[in-house]
Amino acid sequence: MNPLGLFLIYLYTCALTPVSGYPNGKVTSACRSMRPDHGHAPQSEPIHSINVEKTIFKPGDRIKVTLSGSRFDGFLVQARDAENLEGSAVGSFSLTDERISQLLTCDGIQNSAVSHTSKERKLQVELFWIAPANSPKHIQFLATVVEKYKIYWVKIPGPIISQPKAPSIAPKIPSSTIPVVPPPSLSLHKRFNSAGCGSSKFCIRNPVSCDPEHNPECFFLSFRKDGQSVLVEMSGPGQGYISFALSHDQWMGDDDAYLCVKEDDGVQINPAYIRGRSHPEVSSMDVLRDVAWRLEDGVIQCSFRRNIQIPIPKERFDLGRSYFIFLADGDAKDGLLYRHHRQPLMTNRKYCITDFPEDVGGSRSPLIIKLHGAMMFIAWMTTVSIGVIIARFFKPVWPTSSLFGEKIWFQIHRCLMITTVFLTVVAFVLPFIYRGYFSKRAGYHPHLGVTVMILTVLQPVLAVFRPPPQTHRRGIFNWTHWATGTAARIIAVAAMFLGMDLQALDLPDPWDTYTMIGFVLWHVFVDLLLEAHGFCLLKKAKTMEEDQIGILNSSPDEAEGHTFKKIVMTVYICGNLAFLITFLAAINQL
């Protein structure tokens, strides 16, 4: 397989990184509730059990605790005061197998909980609990067990152990083991439509002005204000889920999100909160009502109603304010969300969805990334290509013409190359401004970009130290200058091929690749044509007598050759600009 194919497979593999819960077991955020944010109700009847080696203990005792049952992926074990199961963890644990279990600090108490280290399947976990000096009279062990993402049990009650002579106690049921009944959801009988967009409801559509009733490829999100609540309708093609988020800025993080996840023959609808670039933290559905969904021909549709203002929790934003709005889709399996494989659709500014109804579009590429791509295309498709051809083939065309004290071909070449350096430097900085760091998910593209940047800066530095034409070092400079420039151009083209299909600037496939191949072939063809033309002129000159060579400089053949070069150059520039405008127009449409 060719390197480009391998790279695309690598990108696809990276794109399928799951945004799951905590496969590494670092679940300190769930210490008190012991509940994973998986967006599914826990199972009611536990199939796992907790056993202890003795039921009477004294402070300082070391008691063996065993969690066992059918195979499971993750777990969280704590000991709590049996008379206050909603309180803090009590005591500390030690491990018997650090390969599958790890100690956590909960409620500021070191080693007071134990969790898994990976998603490796387990049948049994053995631990030792150490009773503290100020231990309560009765201790009960609790365990949360995750069999797979949407199948888990919360606070499975274990045996109660007591200190000597402590009065008997009746077992209590932990609150999280009480089954949570989600609000009922209805099945939508017909598709959403765009009627009322911009007049009675706020709409976001991509492609612009598409109608989800007739176009299955339409990504559609609408908000209809109804008193103190808002009715939300969301539709789009999706293999696993579609979602939208309200954000204070144009970057992922600290966002109020809503997920519609395909599960078997239905759709699970949940609010969520996104902290930084981590996976969504699924929240309770209590804030949503009138939940409904529809699945048909690969299109996911869901609707729900929520109040404009929800004081608690704070993760639910006030819909009376303005936000950037994101609309994303991606894969999901067994309720497990995977990272979206393309850039989310995003509004170009903040909107208040409960203010005046509007009908807007969006972009899947941030403006700053569009500028990056546009500048790189201009620099490495047009300015550098024309500049190189001028330097290689047009020195004899204007042998005596000068501009500001330098030969005209050199001034044109220098102007185009300075423009290339300027555009490259500015474009190089833009992704770092947007990301804030060196992207690890962009494959080889950023590495090639850094290489191009180094070579681009090196070229004018070399030019400053260019030796005079008559010195022997001029030949070394010429070869070094040519090799550095050629390497930069080849690597830049490779970087453009890879960059066109990255998430942040995903140009339409497969025409983007074919168009870039067309540009490369066009440039190579013109380059070879001018090279062949020059070779023919040189061969013709060598066949002439020695006394005729001096006449060649002013012969009709030479003038005809110059005219041919000018015609070819004019046609080349027109073709080059056609390719460039095609790419710039595609970027503008993102």
From Swiss-Prot:
Major location category of this protein: membrane
CDD domains according to UniProt: Cyt_b561_FRRS1_like, DOMON_SDR_2_like, Reeler
Limits of the Cytochrome b561 domain: 334-533
Localization: Membrane
Glycosites: 478
Gene Ontology terms: cellular component: membrane
PANTHER family, per the entry: CYTOCHROME B561/FERRIC REDUCTASE TRANSMEMBRANE, FERRIC-CHELATE REDUCTASE 1
Annotated protein name in UniProt: Putative ferric-chelate reductase 1
Phylogenetic placement of the source organism: Eukaryota, Metazoa, Chordata, Craniata, Vertebrata
Name of encoding gene: frrs1
